[in-house]
């Protein structure tokens, strides 16, 4: 195994997990690229990314260009003379000059089994679509969006209770060892590049707040998947009128019950076991929810003091 000089590019916690794995390895992280500090919290103070915070602890030079399209930024990166650049949830587009700068190019850790889900939200979309398995792909980056040759894949099942939060955590454990395997075998050609089958690709669009609103014209199965896919953000929700005020309630957990021939959105039953609502196909039984300004709670706790919010026979 050849010890590699690595540039690491990433921003959130998921990326920091990979940076830590590289720091624990035999390889040498010579520089870190991350997004510029951004205002956060109530005071809107500038907040360094998790990757920057970790890099500074280990006294690694940090670069935070707003863009890598400018020649000065590209020249600065090329001057580092890296063997390879590892990119994990960085958030900036890499021009061709950057992709070609390191000796072995740029490797990306992608949170799906390519080419199934390309794009910004592969973890969430795999749950949303009802996939039964997912994983991580280590790929050689090219100028396309997640279109590069695949070097290594590791799979994991998607459980029936999986949320985006739990799957994110699972992939954060799975991915760093897979990345290290590829890096350790990079110079020996152990991992053969495999072309993606473009016709099998789907684009994993970011989840929107509009999409997060539960639509009773969907099936109960799809709504239940949405609830899990949209957790922890932007969180699935429903609205209902309470004393002429629209209440917005986040939904954390639900289950699918057999279909009843009722108008979609009809409240069928309300008790400690759940709030049952008719959908286009099947009944959605909501078991955990969160009223505005409160913590997530069971239906039983929700109904204490709010027993008249959901009226049996009413249509949401």
Swiss-Prot record:
Gene3D superfamilies: Formyl transferase, C-terminal domain, Formyl transferase, N-terminal domain. Its EC number is 2.1.2.9. Signal peptide: none annotated. GO terms for cellular component: cytosol. Pfam families: Formyl_trans_C, Formyl_trans_N. (6S)-5,6,7,8-tetrahydrofolate binds at residues 112-115. Disulfide bonds: none annotated. CDD domains: FMT_core_Met-tRNA-FMT_N, Met_tRNA_FMT_C. InterPro entries: Fmt (IPR005794), Formyl_trans_C (IPR005793), Formyl_trans_C_sf (IPR037022), Formyl_transf_N (IPR002376), Formyl_transf_N_sf (IPR036477), Formyl_transferase-like_C_sf (IPR011034), GART_AS (IPR001555), Met-tRNA-FMT_C (IPR044135). GO terms for molecular function: methionyl-tRNA formyltransferase activity. It catalyses: L-methionyl-tRNA(fMet) + (6R)-10-formyltetrahydrofolate = N-formyl-L-methionyl-tRNA(fMet) + (6S)-5,6,7,8-tetrahydrofolate + H(+). Keywords: Protein biosynthesis, Transferase. Belongs to the Fmt family. Attaches a formyl group to the free amino group of methionyl-tRNA(fMet). The formyl group appears to play a dual role in the initiator identity of N-formylmethionyl-tRNA by promoting its recognition by IF2 and preventing the misappropriation of this tRNA by the elongation apparatus. This is Methionyl-tRNA formyltransferase. It comes from Glaesserella parasuis serovar 5 (strain SH0165). The lineage of its organism: Bacteria, Pseudomonadati, Pseudomonadota, Gammaproteobacteria, Pasteurellales.
